[in-house]
Amino acid sequence: DGRPFVLEISNPRIREIDLDELEKRSNDNDMAGYNSLHFVQREAVERYKGAAADKVYRVHVKADGKVNKEAVVNAALSFKDANIDQRTPRRVEHRRADLVRKRKIHWIKADAITDDSFDLELETDSGTYVKEFVSGDDGRSVPSFSERLGIQCKVETLDVLAINYQEPMKG
C-alpha cells in the first residue's frame, strides 16, 4: 500500500513536470518506491492532514528472558479492541506536549516465537506509539505488552504494512 504523502515545492524553477517520468526515475534506486503520483489542490492537502489513519504494523520483539509460546499468544489475544493510555514517550517529549493520550489496539497476532523473541502483527489507532506499547516505556504506556506477558520486551524492528485512512467528516 505504501504511505501517502504530500510534497509542496515553493518557487519551483520548473513549473511543468511529467509525474510518470518523475516516478520512473525515482524508482530507479532501492532507497524508496513511489506510485500513483498526482497533483492535488490545497483542499485535498487539508483533508489529508485531518484524516485519521489506523495502521497495521509488523514488529520483531526481543524479550529480556525466555518466553512461553502460549503466554505470548494469550497476551496478544488479550488486546483485542483494548484501550490503552499513553503518556508522551520519553524519546519525543522534547517536541511534544506531555499528555496522556487514549488509544485503541484493534488486534494482535503473534508468530515466529522462539525462546527469547517473537513477531507481532497489530492494528492500532492513529497516533499509537507502538514501540512504547510493547515496552511499556517505564510505565508511560498502560497496559503494555510487556506488562501482560510478564517479561520486559523491546521492539527491534518495526514495519508499517498498511495505512487505513478514514477521510474526515466534511462540513
Protein language model regions, located:
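RNA pseudouridine synthases
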Residues: 1-171
